[in-house]
Amino acid sequence: MNFALILMINTLLALLLMIITFWLPQLNGYMEKSTPYECGFDPMSPARVPFSMKFFLVAITFLLFDLEIALLLPLPWALQTTNLPLMVMSSLLLIIILALSLAYEWLQKGLDWTE
């Protein structure tokens, strides 16, 4: 009962705060605040530099693979389990999924820099 009450109060509080932020007007939204600032001088170069979408996709792919490989880290401790065939099958399944997803990325040319 206490957990449900705390969860409901936290959810209502979060919703209330989100509604308040959408209803409040943007204070002092004049043009001077949205200009780039370089120590009081005019900017030397444009502040909005274009970002490479290819780099972004490779970085996201790297993060996903890095997190999936982190799932393999507890394997040395899992070797002490009594159900060894299940542990081996689950780790092989994870490695096969990693290999297939890497092959898919490679075939879709998601890892190529030049285009």
From Swiss-Prot:
EC number(s) for this protein? 7.1.1.2
A GO cellular component annotated for this chain's UniProt record is: mitochondrial inner membrane
Cellular compartments annotated: Mitochondrion inner membrane
Reactions catalysed: a ubiquinone + NADH + 5 H(+)(in) = a ubiquinol + NAD(+) + 4 H(+)(out)
InterPro entries, per database record: NADH_UbQ/plastoQ_OxRdtase_su3, NDAH_ubi_oxred_su3_sf
Q: Where are the transmembrane segments?
A: 3-23, 55-75, 84-104
Q: What is its main location?
A: mitochondrion
**One example GO MF annotation:** NADH dehydrogenase (ubiquinone) activity
Q: Name one GO biological process term.
A: response to oxidative stress
| Family matches, as Gene3D superfamilies | NADH:ubiquinone/plastoquinone oxidoreductase, chain 3
Write out the entry's keywords from A to Z: Disease variant, Electron transport, Leigh syndrome, Membrane, Mitochondrion, Mitochondrion inner membrane, NAD, Primary mitochondrial disease, Respiratory chain, Translocase, Transmembrane, Transmembrane helix, Transport, Ubiquinone
User: What kind of membrane protein is this, topologically?
Assistant: Multi-pass membrane protein
Q: Which disease is it linked to?
A: Leigh syndrome: An early-onset progressive neurodegenerative disorder characterized by the presence of focal, bilateral lesions in one or more areas of the central nervous system including the brainstem, thalamus, basal ganglia, cerebellum and spinal cord. Clinical features depend on which areas of the central nervous system are involved and include subacute onset of psychomotor retardation, hypotonia, ataxia, weakness, vision loss, eye movement abnormalities, seizures, and dysphagia. Mitochondrial complex I deficiency, mitochondrial type 1: A form of mitochondrial complex I deficiency, the most common biochemical signature of mitochondrial disorders, a group of highly heterogeneous conditions characterized by defective oxidative phosphorylation, which collectively affects 1 in 5-10000 live births. Clinical disorders have variable severity, ranging from lethal neonatal disease to adult-onset neurodegenerative disorders.
Report quaternary structure and partners. Answer: Core subunit of respiratory chain NADH dehydrogenase (Complex I) which is composed of 45 different subunits. Interacts with TMEM186. Interacts with TMEM242.
Functional description taken from the UniProt entry: Core subunit of the mitochondrial membrane respiratory chain NADH dehydrogenase (Complex I) which catalyzes electron transfer from NADH through the respiratory chain, using ubiquinone as an electron acceptor. Essential for the catalytic activity of complex I.
Annotated PANTHER family: NADH-UBIQUINONE OXIDOREDUCTASE CHAIN 3
- Family label: Belongs to the complex I subunit 3 family.
Q: What is this protein called?
A: NADH-ubiquinone oxidoreductase chain 3
UniProt gene name: MT-ND3
